[in-house]
Amino acid sequence: MQDPAPALYGLRQRFPSPGGKTMVREGFFGALRLEEYARRVVCPHERTLAGPKADRLKLLRATRANLSSVFLLYQDRANKLAAELAGGFEQPALAIATDASGIEHSLWRFEAPTLQKAAQDFLKGQAVVIADGHHRYETALAYAAECRAAAGSAGGVRDPPWTFALAYFANAYAPGTLLLPIHRVIRSGRVPKAAEWRTRLPGWHHEEVPLASMEGLPILLAEQLGPRRGLPAFAADDGSGTLQIFWRPARPGEISIRAIHAEVIGGVFGIGEDAVRQGAIDYPKDALDAAREVRAGQGVVALYLNPLSPEEVFSVTAAGEVLPQKSTFFLPKLPTGLLFRLLEGPSEPVG
């Protein structure tokens, strides 16, 4: 059903965290004005691949619609925008559904011009970071370039709908916006002995911690890595029943995941960018999945990592740089097909 008038759509997701606690994230959908990355208005945090973009471009040409959204993060430490939009979430929801993973999704339509203006005013001039949907965003840019070339100098609509994309906006600092780590499993090679670890990682502190059972791994990692968030820190697990914990002081302006890739994956294991592209590393999101891979002989060592902070993500993107492949993921994922946006007719921008 086509909306009769411009609106934002609020989404509340109630979900279980990895630790079992029930959490809530609120955000909203709107039309995002497309900007080239060089303008530093919409910022990527990772690189993309050509193949997925080619497939998405074919789909966009065929449907002339956004069938899924780009997931964007904005910065609002004081939660000011959420307070402005709270009235919209107090109305009866349009729909409520729970998916197979136990996430409850509730959808609202924000018709009030005051709510729409609050979002536009807050986001005006603020850079946003793509949390998920880099391929979708770059495909939208490519499609817009095609449409612009086809239109030529004929004029027409000032802001045609293909100059916007369907986007979901969430506050990076809200309690329900979870940035979680993606771990590494080194697929092959020889596992360093304790003395070799220390030799290859000068300046790093080291502890050996027994792992009594796999079931206790999440708690053990929280105890050992949690207090060292923001530092280059990791736990190495070769399946022997002992975790090797390493950390060192952070250097000014340093991003922890970059240090680990340079000094551990590159320095200890000798794995460069070419080997990474050829599949030398697997990327489990769950530490228990990484542990199972090692114990099943699908890898020689798992490297368990801390999550990145919003500050680390925004500092990298503000400099026009990107993080190593699969540095972080965001929970919960957005449902696909909840909203569609036609690339015909008027558009009302949010950011």
How would you describe each model-predicted region?
Residues 1-351:
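Surface-exposed, charge/polar-rich loops and edge strands
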